[in-house]
Each structure stands twice: as structure tokens, then as C-alpha cells.
Regions:
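Charged, low-complexity helical/coil segments in non-catalytic cytosolic or luminal regions
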Residues: 23, 48-244
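Short, flexible, mixed-charge glycine/proline-rich loop motifs
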Residues: 1-8, 19-26
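Short cysteine/histidine-rich zinc-coordinating motifs and their immediately flanking basic loops
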Residues: 24-30, 43-49
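Extended, hydrophilic extramembrane loops/domains of integral membrane proteins
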Residues: 236-261
Length: 261
């Protein structure tokens, strides 16, 4: 761990306040959020050591190619956003995430109808059967992610998910050279309720999808019980580029593992 402190440093942007951590050999000439100048602040603090890291698989050339394809689909995008000078500023950055693994027992009650209609002679008949349906399941959710940086828009980060958590690695300084890395500033106590909300939705989706063969399904009640939950801090790879024009900020973000834009 002392090695980690010796080889990394923190830079603070005086314009937007973003705090970026990178290898000391990396030249920090602009903030990847606002492109303002950055200055050396302090060293990587031990309490911010991540447990896991998702290494970059997409290189800068591929990121630029995908950006150019993406930019052609966006109306009224300033031409300067895709200029050569701007393309050079596309940045690989490790974004802090909290990953939650949880075992959940989910329950769902529903009132379902099966409606049959037929015609006999001059009459049309309808038969409605009503069923009270109950579902219960024990489910495991592994490494459900959520952005741990207040500088990043949650919607932007969620739009480039998912990551393949099978490729998570134990954190090592060896993954940092050539990339920026931001420290988290949203503690797990802030983010955990948001992740639990995702897990509740996922549980209910699974239970709801198990109810089929009915004309109508009305959910009467749901319940989710978290039996066991663990949380770990990880760095996830993102290619980013921002551009400011007047009072508007344009953001391009791409999953550095899968290439999803």
C-alpha cells in the first residue's frame, strides 16, 4: 500500500472542483469534466483504496471511432465537439462505484383473470375466472453497481452499463498508468439505498415475469427481504469527453470495458 501512495497523486480543478487521482507519470493538463487547468493537490489517501478494478479493454483509437459514429446521430451538436483538437482530449478515467452483492427473498401477490369469450347462436358469452396468485423466490444479485462520484451524472453512468463483473480484478496500481482515476465522494451509506432500490425492482420484475397465461394481472402486494448484503468499492473504466459552448455542456461517455455508448 505504501507503494500506491508513492506512485500516485491527486489533482484538483479550481474551476469545477473535481478531484482526479492518477499515476504520477501522467501529465494532467486539463480537467476531464470541464477542461479547466488542474494543479497538484495531495497524495492518494489510504482510505480510498478500492477493493476491485475493472480494467480498460477498449483503447483510445476505438473510443474515438465510436465517438465519431455517435456524434453523427446527434442533432445540433457543435462541430467543434468533434474537431481534431477536441478528439485529442478524450480521456480514459476510472470512475468510483459501489458494488453490492445481496441475497433477497421476494414475495408477490396478484389478482389474475382468465377471460374466455364465445358465440352461440345470436348470443355472445364471456366467462371470467379469477385467481389469486402468489410467488416467492430466493434470489442472488451479484455486484450491482452505482456511481459513487457526485461529479458524474447517474443517468449517464447507468446508460453505459452493464459491465461484465466476471472480469473484475483485485485492485493494483498497475492498472492506473495512462488513465485518470477519481476518488469517491458519496459514501456507501448514501448509495446503498439506491442500489437496494434497483434490487427491489429486479426482484419484482423476475416475480412478475413468472406470472403468465392470464388475460389480466393486477399486483396486489410485494415484499422484499434482504437476507445478506455486502458492499465493495471498485473503479470502473469510462472513456469521456466534454465540451462547453456558451452555457451548454456536452458529454460523451463510453463503457471502457464493453464499448457501449
Amino acid at each position: 500500500w505504501s507503494n500506491l501512495e508513492e506512485n500516485t497523486a491527486s489533482y484538483s480543478c479550481p474551476r469545477c472542483g473535481a478531484e482526479i487521482v492518477c499515476d504520477k507519470t501522467t501529465t494532467a493538463t486539463f480537467c476531464c469534466y470541464c477542461h479547466g487547468p488542474v494543479v497538484l493537490n495531495d497524495k492518494f489517501k489510504g482510505e480510498f483504496k478500492p477493493s476491485k478494478v475493472m480494467p480498460f479493454k477498449v483503447n483510445k483509437e476505438t473510443a474515438i471511432e465510436k465517438f465519431l459514429k455517435w456524434s453523427k446521430k446527434i442533432w445540433f451538436l457543435p462541430k467543434e465537439f468533434s474537431s481534431y483538437k477536441q478528439l485529442e482530449k478524450i480521456t480514459g478515467i476510472y470512475i468510483p462505484f459501489w458494488l453490492v452483492t445481496s441475497n433477497v427473498t421476494g414475495e408477490m401477490s396478484a389478482r389474475c383473470k382468465r377471460i374466455n369469450t364465445w358465440v352461440s347462436g345470436d348470443y355472445r358469452y364471456t366467462k371470467t375466472d379469477v385467481y389469486h396468485v402468489y410467488r416467492e423466490a430466493n434470489l442472488n444479485f451479484n455486484n450491482v453497481p452505482h456511481n459513487a462520484s457526485s461529479k458524474m451524472d447517474d443517468n449517464v453512468m447507468e446508460s453505459i452499463e452493464p459491465y461484465d463483473d466476471r472480469e473484475l480484478k483485485d485492485f493494483s496500481i498497475a492498472y492506473l498508468p495512462g488513465f485518470f482515476s477519481e476518488k469517491y465522494d458519496r459514501g456507501k451509506e448514501q448509495v446503498l439505498p439506491l442500489i437496494e432500490g434497483k434490487i427491489r425492482m429486479g426482484t419484482n420484475d423476475i416475480l412478475r415475469n413468472s406470472i403468465s397465461g392470464y388475460s389480466t394481472v393486477d399486483i396486489v402486494g410485494t415484499n422484499e427481504r434482504f437476507n445478506k448484503t455486502s458492499c465493495q468499492y471498485a473503479l470502473m473504466p469510462v472513456w469521456m469527453m466534454t465540451y462547453s459552448s456558451g452555457d451548454r455542456n456536452y458529454i460523451f461517455a463510453m463503457n471502457g470495458q464493453t464499448g457501449k455508448v
